Amino acid sequence: MSEAFLRFDGISVEFPGVKALDEVSFSARAGEVHALMGENGAGKSTLLKVLSGVNRPSSGQLWIDGQAHVFANAREALAHGIAIIYQELTLSPNLSVAENLLLGQLPERRGFIDRRTMKARAREILEELGEGDIDPATKVRELSIGQQQMIEIGRALLRDARIIAFDEPTSSLSVQETRQLKRIVARLRDEGRVVLYVTHRMEEVFEMCDAVTVFRDGRHIRTHETLEGLDHDMLVGEMVGRQIDDVYGFRPRDIGDVLMRIDGLQGRGVNEPVNLEVRRGEVLGLFGLVGAGRSELMRLVCGVEKASRGQVALRGETRVFASPHQAIRAGIAMCPEDRKSQGIFPVASVSDNLNISCRRFFRRWGMFRHAARETDNAKTYIQRLSIKTPSHRTPINTLSGGNQQKVILGRWLAEEIDLFVMDEPTRGIDVGARRDIYALLYDLAEQGKGVIVISSDLAEVSSICDRIGVMRDGVLVDIVPREQATQARLLGLALPA
């Protein structure tokens, strides 16, 4: 086996009041896919920022091919062959594919950009990536997330990156795009590159990776140089510091009367009329590939988009919602897929994010904010939902994804909400926080609320839901009871015929 090409030696990173990394030491080999695992806040992202020159370590050294380095900025790291493919892509949406691929090294001729050469180089790399059908002149904003990710990888290859790190790369990809990414990662390994792979998906670790390093609370817990003898439960135990027998923790409960009925609803992204019921106490899943119409259907229900036909009956009363605000007042709340841009106010505090929807309840004489009541309400939900935050005044964008999701849920608990629509509720969330989110959803169902979970995670929908509606190409093709919802059956229904 080859010697370590990349080595972290006693890396520590400190911020005011927080030790993000605490003397982390481990190594990765050339020609290896090395998984980095841990709960949100465990230190994985901070480590990648040290590697890429975004954060400078307080102590310790980084060794690459036997030479010590401390990068002052991202440009230095890039010059030494390091590329990071972040979960939030760094492409310029209004530039073309070719311009994004060669940004910083655009070919010139007589002082001008040589566009013919630029497009030719872009075509070569696109062919290498299996994306030869993409026109190099296409604006990046017109590509799918999976295609954009391939452009990021292509940019790394054009810079001859020897170390490529992926941060939750499959969190927004379709099944087909995920397969393509796995092929590319295998190719990078076969070419002798170091591939660091951050993921919360256990199946990806065992399918794709050669080694795994586990982090917890900023510390290196263990590096497994081989996955032989390693199983799901052992990894989870190392990540959370305790044994979790069942992440999903399904809780059977009584299912009540019909809470909401969808009759012949159709609109943008929903190509045929949909008929669907949600009952009190029920967790109903909506599964399908990216673009299948799951989120689009719920956007029609919640008043985000206008339906072209059909209606919604809530508690037996037919309703037409012209806006999400009307839906919320009626008792329907949606927690969106994109938490950062649609679910939270990122620079506002945890308290402000918790209270934003119910501020009308905390007024003096109907006009002025009652700060003390808002603080009490925030502290109540922080404790009730076990939100990990230094203070109710902490900016929400400093919290992990799981804790941000709890804040969004807590916001609606203060309202009189009967139906909770959760769009990809555990995307990018670690295993411990996932269990907490599932427990909260079961709590809501046991209180007689209705819960709809939109998810592209087969294991999730088949494990936590009482029934699963499967959508394909804007059509609800079947509704499968939990007892019959094997992953093979659900995927078979979701894939194109």
UniProtKB/Swiss-Prot annotation:
GO CC entries: plasma membrane
Catalytic activity annotation: L-arabinose(out) + ATP + H2O = L-arabinose(in) + ADP + phosphate + H(+)
Annotated family: Belongs to the ABC transporter superfamily. Arabinose importer (TC 3.A.1.2.2) family.
GO molecular function, a single term: ATP hydrolysis activity
Pfam families referenced in this protein's UniProt entry, alphabetically: ABC_tran (PF00005)
Subunit structure: The complex is composed of two ATP-binding proteins (AraG), two transmembrane proteins (AraH) and a solute-binding protein (AraF).
Keyword Transmembrane among UniProt keywords: no
First-tier enzyme category under EC: translocase
InterPro entries: AAA+_ATPase, ABC_carbohydrate_import_ATPase, ABC_transporter-like_ATP-bd, ABC_transporter-like_CS, P-loop_NTPase
Positions annotated to bind ATP: G38, E39, N40, G41, A42, G43, K44, S45
Gene assigned in the entry: araG
UniProt protein name: Arabinose import ATP-binding protein AraG
Main function: Part of the ABC transporter complex AraFGH involved in arabinose import. Responsible for energy coupling to the transport system.
Sorted UniProt keywords: ATP-binding, Cell inner membrane, Cell membrane, Membrane, Nucleotide-binding, Repeat, Sugar transport, Translocase, Transport
Top-level lineage group: Bacteria
